[in-house]
């Protein structure tokens, strides 16, 4: 990467100018990169990119055209790329970039099928090109606080992790565009749940080996007011005034994903875990409980000012706990973690620095969520989660 070697800002591409494409701007803000190109099949998105990233950037209708573009020296016009396109396109785009020798930041989830996730890892291993998956919750203050408490031994050895996810903005975020379609997201237990499944694995120190899922389309399927919103982006229709949830309008024409789902997991280190999400709650936050051999912890709130409480003496009902730790930072939820995640990506592709995120862990979050979603749609049948190829895992 010539820009890296010269010490100048990296030349960055953004592929997919949607709701998450703004994350690339963090590299610009830090001075570590400059956005020089975007690719998106939508002409409206390409026009929007000029407003978002500045006039003068190169625009392409296809990521392959961007890959083929050459600079004055005959090399690639970019040093790295952010893939923030719809989930079902991640695999094709990421594999092409990796094979072209362009380091990649892939927005989570890594892919919508296990085969695609494994193919991306294989492409990274075979090409030797650096792959990074944007599991930004590993940089959320509430998560790092809980992990620090665990690693200090305050609750002993972890034996169980429970997460309840109240997705209060679910109607606006996931049921008015492609997220609502199985063909493009697989399901929200993957699209949304991959965040927390990854964190459950991280806090527990293991990966799921057996899962059972349950859930269904319990509310949004009853709303008949539908609209093709492909001419708009989520901020244009988002409103907290859309309450109660059955008053939502202009939902996606196709809705075949679950709006409530849950999964129980047995991990390969003997930890048991569960994750539940509901997309029509009035509030929007996630609540973790981690139980160990010498106590338990629980978070109340997940942004700045929230607290994590620890119980490590025997008692009855005691809401205060034995210790309380305040969450500092993350005033806007995991968006504050985006900056730290992008900074880590830049360091990783520049000098190979160690990362908190892991492409293998991202693959295992996909594997778990895909298996759990299959379980939901097959009568809640327990399903074994395939392990990653050990050789490939050593190379990415």
Language-model features, listed with the residues they occupy:
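Hydrophobic residues in well-ordered beta-strands that form the structural core
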Residues: 106, 112, 131-133, 162, ...
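C-terminal capping/lid region of NAD(P)-dependent oxidoreductase domains
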Residues: 2, 7, 129, 156-160, ...
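C-terminal glycine/acidic-rich active-site capping loop/insertion
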Residues: 218-262, 266-267, 286-360, 364, ...
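Glycine-rich phosphate/pyrophosphate-binding beta-alpha loops
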Residues: 194, 276-284
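Beta-loop-alpha module in the N-terminal Rossmann-like domain of NAD(P)-dependent dehydrogenases
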Residues: 55-123
């Amino acid at each position: 990467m010539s820009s890296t070697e010269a010490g100048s800002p990296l030349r960055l591409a953004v592929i997919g100018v949607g709701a998450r494409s703004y994350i690339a701007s963090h590299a610009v803000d830090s001075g570590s990169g400059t956005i020089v190109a975007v690719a998106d099949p939508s002409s409206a998105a390409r026009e929007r990119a000029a407003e978002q990233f500045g006039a003068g950037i190169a625009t392409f209708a296809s990521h392959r055209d961007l890959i083929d573009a050459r600079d004055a020296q005959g090399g690639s016009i970019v040093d790295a790329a952010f893939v923030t396109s719809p989930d079902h396109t991640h695999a094709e785009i990421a594999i092409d970039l990796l094979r072209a020798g362009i380091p990649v930041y892939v927005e989570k989830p890594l892919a919508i099928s296990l085969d695609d996730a494994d193919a991306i890892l294989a492409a990274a291993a075979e090409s030797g090109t650096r792959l990074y998956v944007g599991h930004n919750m590993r940089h959320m203050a509430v998560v790092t606080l809980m992990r620090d408490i665990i690693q200090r031994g305050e609750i002993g050895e972890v034996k169980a992790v429970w997460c309840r996810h109240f997705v209060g903005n679910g109607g606006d975020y996931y049921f008015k565009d492609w997220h609502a379609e199985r063909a493009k997201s697989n399901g929200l237990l993957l699209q949304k749940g991959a965040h927390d499944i990854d964190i459950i694995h991280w806090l527990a120190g293991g990966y799921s080996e057996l899962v059972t899922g349950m859930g269904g389309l319990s509310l949004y399927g009853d709303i008949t007011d539908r609209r093709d919103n492909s001419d708009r982006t989520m901020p244009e229709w988002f409103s907290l005034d859309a309450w109660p949830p059955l008053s939502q309008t202009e939902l996606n024409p196709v809705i075949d994903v679950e709006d409530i789902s849950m999964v129980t997991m047995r991990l390969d280190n003997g930890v048991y875990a569960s994750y539940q999400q509901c997309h029509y709650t009035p509030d929007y936050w996630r609540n973790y409980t981690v139980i160990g051999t010498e106590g338990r912890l629980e978070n109340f709130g997940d942004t700045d000012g929230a607290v994590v409480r620890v119980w490590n003496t025997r008692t009855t009902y005691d809401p205060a706990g034995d210790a309380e730790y305040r969450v500092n930072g993350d005033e806007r939820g995991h968006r504050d973690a985006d900056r730290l995640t992008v900074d880590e990506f830049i360091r990783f592709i520049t000098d190979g620095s160690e990362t908190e995120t892991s492409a293998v862990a991202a693959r295992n979050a996909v594997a778990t969520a895909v298996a759990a979603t299959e379980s939901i749609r097959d009568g809640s049948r327990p399903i074994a989660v395939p392990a990653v190829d050990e050789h490939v895992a050593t190379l990415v």
